[in-house]
Every structure is written in C-alpha cells, then in structure tokens.
C-alpha cells in the first residue's frame, strides 16, 4: 500500500522537482508505514534523507503546537475561546482602549476570521525578540477582509506564553517534536539571503527566527514519526479531549476550523478524502491530513524550498496527487 501511495512523491524526487520527500501513513489502530527518497541536503554538502531526519515543519506549528496548546488551556479553564486575547495579553494595543485588536477573541484568531494581514516582515524592524513582540502587540494593524494570517498565530503564541509563564519551547509536545535546534540530523531548507547561509536545523521563517526561533506560527521541527504520533493521538482520541476534537472539526469561518482547514474543492489534500477530513500545510513543503471517517492520517514532508523557494516545484499538485494515492491505496487495502 505505502509504495503505491508514495509513487507521486518518488516521481517528483526522481524528476528533480524536489530534493527529498518522506511520506508517513497511520491508522487509528496505530499501524504505520513510512517511505522516503532523495536528499536531505544538496548544499553545501550532499546528504541522503533518512527516516531519522528532522524537518522544519513551518506552519504545521500552527496546528501541532499552538492550536493544541490553546485548546488544552481551554480544557483546563485557563482561557475561554470566545473571550478576547486581552484576557491573556492586557497590554495588547494598551494605548488605545477602543482599538479593534483588543476585541479579537481566541476563536477569531484560530479560525482566521480577523482583519489582520496575512504576513508582515516583522524581522525587518529589529533583532531583539522581546522588542519585536512588543511591536506586534502595539502596532495599529491595517484592516482587511479575513485571510489566513501568521499574525493571528503570533498573537496566540504570545498569549500561551503569558498564560503559562513559560516559552513555547517548554510545552511537552511528544516524542520527536520540538522547537529548534532539533536534537538529530536536520533537513536543509533555503539559502537565506537575510542570514547569509543555508539553513539547517534553524527555523526557515524569518519572523519566527527574529522572535527567538519559537513563535505561534512557525518554529517547530519534527520527524515523520513525530508527526504521525501527533496525528494518531487525534485519531484514537488520546491526544485531545472531546471538546478539542470538536473544535478542530467544526467550522469557524469559511473552510476553516479552530486552526485547521476542512476539505473543500481544490484543497491540497485531494478530492478522494471524506468530508470529515482536516489538514494543514507548511511553506517549507510539509503537510498533514486527518480523515476521521476512515481513521487515517498521512503526512508528506519535503524540503521543496532547498536551496531556494524561487522555483516551481509543483508542490500543490504533488500534495493533491499524494492525497489521492493514499486514499486509493487505503481503500483497496481495507
């Protein structure tokens, strides 16, 4: 089954569209299969990809870490999803008590239904993580229609740190998941013009790097096994409460739930998955999808930005083709 499911990714590696790829599939009963091919790095020294390599998970941080943290704190009664972020961050836009940012709720940010912009080059405003956090909190953000926004999750990350009194990196995320630098071999990402080097074991996202390497929107690293372990916890119910599972599956805005995307026409998970499927992707070439009806999850991890993001790797179509192949192979096998 796994060989059939991995065929699109194997072809992408063989054709030179991406340096390396790993596919992991897990069922609710814990059965797992993994395949990988290609290179963890092309530069500065060639390095073959192995099952033990840690990937920069990019925006999978939003669901594996930040969303899970927020929902756990809600379970514990330490925050209310429908209360404003100012419950945790009283100094958010503190010099304008009428500011719209002060009315944003945790659920608003989780579901990307705010007016905040998709992204802002926060890293260009300085190199002190504490001052950059203050900048994010005090900035009068330009308003626009709801979009998928890193700023939403930077704010959520700050809120989690305020509530717990500890950095995000202190949160126990599970085996083979954590903020960088990872403890094992790392997959290379981009030749970063800002930092003047090829990144390997340090976060690719510029804003996350400037915020100290750990932020609500990016910064998490993990192996295939680590991502599958998280996904299995969602499938078997051991990794999230019933309330948290309901929150990540129920629509909040358009095709979004608390943190995740729901299946919609043209999404990166493919068309074959059930309507009860949620997923998320990461800029570095990562992705995770969970089909609750089938009791199935799969993760496709690539280093498609290595050595540069400025090339057409066909990652969107590869993700869709992989989703179709995974579901097709699963349905034939079970």
Predicted segment positions?
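Active-site SXXK
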Residues: 6-10, 23, 29-30, 56-82, ...
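Short loop/turn microsegments at loop-to-beta-strand junctions
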Residues: 19-21, 284-287
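Acidic helix-start/capping segments at beta-turn-to-alpha-helix junctions
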Residues: 85-93
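Short, conserved catalytic-motif segment at the N-terminal edge
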Residues: 2-57, 78, 309
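Short, gly/Ser/Thr-rich active-site loops of penicillin-recognizing serine hydrolases
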Residues: 236, 243-244, 249-254, 265-267, ...
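Short, well-ordered beta-strand elements
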Residues: 33-35, 288, 295-304, 308
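Short, surface-exposed loop or secondary-structure junction motifs
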Residues: 34, 84, 96-276
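Catalytic tyrosine of NAD(P)H-dependent dehydrogenase/reductases that use a Tyr as the general acid/base
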Residues: 55-58, 146-148
